[in-house]
């Protein structure tokens, strides 16, 4: 029996990134708590470098707050440096996934072990030997391409059977 949690864990890498956090004075009982709440909001969604694993964001450093004269909202802006577990599949990576639907266009699958991916395996990538599979089958695919937008809850992947 393989360790299912380690398969998903190996897909994430620890990365450090920089961001600007706006803290409104109305929400400010403690500046540290307000900053922590703001950086926790990115967990479980995509940022510019990939999907952020829930519970993995850590604040490394922050600047002193500054205000912008143009902005009348009263927000205080902080430059923060954080580290987090990030998932961003590259071309050639292998992903294990569970088949959801099969139709004449191909296969639609979700990442196994709660991996935040929606995988589409098109028949056009398998002209002669398209592997027949059924819903709930576990398959392995190779990433041909991927895309996501900021705040997406999963990464869309085009794959082919391995």
What are the residue ranges of the model-derived segments?
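Single-stranded RNA-binding regions, centering on S1/OB-family and related RNA-binding modules
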Residues: 2-162
């Amino acid at each position: 029996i393989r360790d299912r949690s380690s398969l998903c864990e190996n897909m994430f890498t620890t990365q450090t990134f920089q961001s600007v956090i706006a803290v409104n004075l109305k929400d400010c009982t403690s500046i540290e708590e307000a900053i922590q709440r703001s950086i926790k909001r990115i967990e479980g969604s995509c940022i510019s470098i990939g999907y952020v694993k829930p519970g993995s964001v850590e604040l490394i450093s922050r600047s002193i707050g500054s205000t912008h004269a143009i902005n009348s909202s009263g927000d205080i802006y902080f430059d923060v440096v954080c580290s987090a577990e990030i998932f961003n599949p590259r071309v050639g990576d292998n992903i294990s996934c569970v088949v959801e639907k099969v139709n004449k266009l191909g296969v639609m699958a979700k990442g196994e072990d709660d991996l935040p991916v929606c995988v589409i395996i098109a028949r056009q990538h398998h002209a002669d030997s398209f592997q027949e599979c059924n819903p709930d089958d576990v398959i392995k695919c190779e990433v041909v391409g991927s895309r996501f937008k900021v705040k997406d809850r999963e990464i869309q992947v085009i794959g082919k059977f391995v």
